[in-house]
């Protein structure tokens, strides 16, 4: 009888210990999830910035990677990738280096069609067209004979100029993940075709599918802040071996470099 009571007490103690320990792990996970969400909220605060010249006066996260007198450079990058079934993958996008020291902005409009050779290996056909930004307008810095392409470049808008995440708290099916070994972290949300950002993308790009996209926020580096890590977002419409349709965007603050543009 005494042995039965001791055994019962022992089992009860183990169950209580396990329960408390489990609660501890749960609190840690909840805390990390909150930290990740707060980190992405800081990233999304720049959306929208309609006038790109506002970045000249916008401060970013600084650490020991920055020289004392370096005000830093904002790097904005937007790209649409479309690979219809049975066709080549094509990407069209732009990257702009907004230098706060010189208050000048230079970059490239980049078109890349990826073909495959006889062995199925990818072949890049990348073309870069140099541009500058002045008075919030994109201007090609070299002659472009193709009028349609020239107009596409001049009318280009970065996602940060029109994207808006004020309703992110209402996004459904939030899936938060964290890998401490890299470290890397992400948040995935299922969107609807009625969502503002999705409507804006469909308005600006000829997206050959009516499928509802998912929003993936990705980051790596120290969650508390680092100029070495990166953050970007992706709207994934279709992703498989035969067909890919997605849009990527990033706004990064980095130490300035002489050869960056």
From Swiss-Prot:
One GO cellular component term: plasma membrane
Record's bilayer topology term: Lipid-anchor
Top-level taxon in the UniProt lineage: Bacteria
Pfam families named in the record: DUF576
Entries under PROSITE patterns matching the protein: PROKAR_LIPOPROTEIN
Lipid-bearing positions (N-palmitoyl cysteine): 23
Lipidation (S-diacylglycerol cysteine): 23
Gene3D superfamilies: 2.50.20.40
Signal sequence region: 1-22
Keywords of this entry: Cell membrane, Lipoprotein, Membrane, Palmitate, Signal
InterPro entries (alphabetical): Csa (IPR007595), Csa_sf (IPR038641)
Intracellular or extracellular location(s): Cell membrane
Homology family: Belongs to the staphylococcal tandem lipoprotein family.
Protein's UniProt name: Uncharacterized lipoprotein SERP2445
Source species: Staphylococcus epidermidis (strain ATCC 35984 / DSM 28319 / BCRC 17069 / CCUG 31568 / BM 3577 / RP62A)
């Amino acid at each position: 009888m005494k042995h039965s009571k001791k055994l019962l007490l022992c089992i009860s103690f183990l169950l209580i210990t396990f329960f408390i320990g489990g609660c501890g792990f749960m609190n840690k996970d909840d805390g990390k999830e909150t930290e990740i969400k707060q980190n992405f909220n800081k990233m999304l605060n720049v959306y929208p910035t309609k006038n790109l010249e506002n970045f000249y006066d916008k401060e970013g996260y600084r650490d020991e990677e920055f020289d004392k007198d370096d005000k830093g450079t904002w790097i904005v990058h937007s790209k649409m990738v479309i690979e219809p079934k049975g066709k080549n993958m094509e990407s069209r996008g732009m990257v702009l280096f907004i230098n706060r020291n010189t208050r000048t902005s230079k970059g490239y409009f980049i078109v890349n069609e990826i073909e495959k050779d006889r062995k199925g290996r990818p072949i890049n056909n990348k073309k870069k067209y140099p541009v500058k930004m002045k008075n919030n307008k994109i201007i090609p810095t070299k002659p472009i004979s193709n009028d349609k392409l020239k107009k596409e470049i001049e009318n280009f808008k970065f996602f940060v100029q029109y994207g808006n995440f004020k309703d992110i708290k209402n996004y459904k099916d939030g899936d938060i993940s964290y890998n401490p070994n890299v470290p890397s972290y992400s948040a995935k949300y299922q969107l609807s075709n009625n969502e503002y950002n999705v409507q804006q993308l469909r308005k600006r790009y000829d997206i050959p599918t009516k499928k509802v996209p998912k929003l993936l926020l990705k980051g790596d580096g120290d969650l508390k802040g680092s100029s070495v890590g990166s953050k970007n977002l992706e709207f994934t419409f279709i992703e498989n071996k035969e067909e890919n349709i997605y849009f990527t965007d990033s706004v990064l603050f980095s130490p300035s470099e002489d050869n960056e543009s």
